From Swiss-Prot:
Its structure and the presence of conserved basic residues indicates that it probably binds RNA. The keyword Glycoprotein does not apply. It comes from the Bacteria. The gene is ybcJ. This is Putative RNA-binding protein YbcJ. Residues 12-68 form the S4 RNA-binding domain.
Amino acid sequence: MATFSLGKHPHVELCDLLKLEGWSESGAQAKIAIAEGQVKVDGAVETRKRCKIVAGQTVSFAGHSVQVVA
């Protein structure tokens, strides 16, 4: 499983994480995928586009998974 470092930031918004990981070409595509229930956070479907993802959470989409670290 890949990891994503928050660096100095306390969180990253879910739609931004999809873009930063290269799983979505644009913010609009990321938001559509989230709204359609294609994204899971810690194993549960997440439909909030701007959901704040913090260290320790795992995000999955289209066969990819990433563990968020501080």
